[in-house]
């Protein structure tokens, strides 16, 4: 019996950790626009998932920052920071990003602006281009 004690203790620990009824509570944070079919963000336990953001100005989703990819990346990152702030988080808390570009040729300039927002670490990232994002939306 003594030789199985470590296994029993390990299994008990694993099963205890799997009881996530309180730890992984899911909270859906509604989007500012009640016409969209998704949440602005969803929190599961301590993890916050943010829906895709664009370079809209002043909560007006019909007004996209002008001037090309760099200003759009910066406005998009500001919009992300604003959502994080509402949930007592910062860019330092981000662990994964997905960047979608209208034009793959914007990868370089987008990356140059993107890294300015991550001073303490580099989150995992997936980036792809050639997507139809909408009128005037580059990222």
Residue ranges and their predicted role:
Residues 4-95, 101-139:
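N-terminal presequence-like segments and the immediate start of the first folded domain
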């Amino acid at each position: 019996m003594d030789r199985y004690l470590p296994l029993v203790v390990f299994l008990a620990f694993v099963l205890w950790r799997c009881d996530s009824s309180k730890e992984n509570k899911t909270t859906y944070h509604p989007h500012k626009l009640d016409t969209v079919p998704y949440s602005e963000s969803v929190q599961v336990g301590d993890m916050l998932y943010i829906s895709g953001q664009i370079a809209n100005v002043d909560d007006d989703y019909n007004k996209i920052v002008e001037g090309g990819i760099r200003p759009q990346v910066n406005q998009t990152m500001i919009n992300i920071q604003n959502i994080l702030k509402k949930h007592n988080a910062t860019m330092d808390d981000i662990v994964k990003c997905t960047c979608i570009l209208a034009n793959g040729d914007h990868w370089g300039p987008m990356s140059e602006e993107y890294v300015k927002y991550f001073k303490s670490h580099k989150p995992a990232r997936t980036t792809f281009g050639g997507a139809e994002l909408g009128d005037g939306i580059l990222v």
